[in-house]
């Protein structure tokens, strides 16, 4: 769970997998379920070959159709109970302690952030910073995966703040440098 690479194409997934990502999260925003499935088949196969967890972002039906290992749901997404009924890994997003505590009642892990400002999600909440991340990590009993503005220069800070791992979008192609920084912090 140390390095989640959020990807929207097979090439980025391949680079992330070869660089040491431990989870590939298939993230296609505003795309119909059948297209998520069709475009995700090759990435699912890549994950199986590399022994990596394959998680689908936001779309429970696509995850089930792809035989995914898990689903990550945002705060406004539905389907958490269905994910659990099917025995899949469930990640839920949270931007604060109260939200994380509520999510942790059902989730296998909590995605916390944004830690720092990020251009990958223009409508993101205000950054929680390392102190907010630390508070959130202490407040829940499930692993916390930090997200938002994370790259090789600051990933280790998230681990030192208590996160079990980090999730990246822009830095997914830099997985090798991220993994080296994370391994050094562990």
Per-region residue spans from a language model:
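Conserved N-terminal beta1-alpha1 strand-loop-helix module at the mouth
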Residues: 1-109, 131, 135-144, 151-163, ...
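A short acidic, helix-capping loop that chelates divalent metal ions and anchors anionic groups
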Residues: 26, 63, 116-122
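Non-cysteine beta-strand/loop elements that form the S-adenosyl-L-methionine
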Residues: 108-116
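Short Gly/Pro-enriched loop/turn and capping motifs at secondary-structure junctions
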Residues: 115-118, 150-153
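Substrate-recognition "cap/lid" segment bordering the active-site pocket of phosphatases
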Residues: 121-134
